[in-house]
Amino acid sequence: MTSTEFVSDSPASTEAFAAQWAQTLMPDTTVLLYGDLGAGKTTFIRGLARGLGVTEPVRSPTFTLTHEYTIQQPPNLRGLPLFHIDLYRIETAAQLHTLGLDEIFERSGVAAIEWAERLELWGESLPVAHLWGVRLIPTGDAERRIVIECLQKPPAAADTTR
């Protein structure tokens, strides 16, 4: 699978990298974010949102659990939803199921999920075409190593020229 690494020396650098990477996303994509408290998950999503043309302020949905924004760019994603989901407070499968993740995944937009390790409580695979894992690893006061790995992509289209 495909992977990319980047060393960020500041929150602004993390946002800029995420904004640039956002331009490569396709419809029906889920981005799973992993990292300790304060590692920069929300900062990364803020940059992702900026790269998708979201102009509203992007804040962590720790208490509301989900925020929805409308993607403005690139053209292949324009008008689709960007879901920012924070699973930090989720402790049980029942809590996870009340979020309506099935409905979110059916909307074919982009879902960015903080504290993605909590998805293990869900007990089923994610019904999405494109799945990315993003690990944010602090290596200094402001420095972060960002590792992005493609976890799942749709099979190549069948050859219909025969």
Which residues does each predicted region cover?
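Hydrophobic anchor at the beta1->P-loop junction of P-loop NTPases
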Residues: 31-33
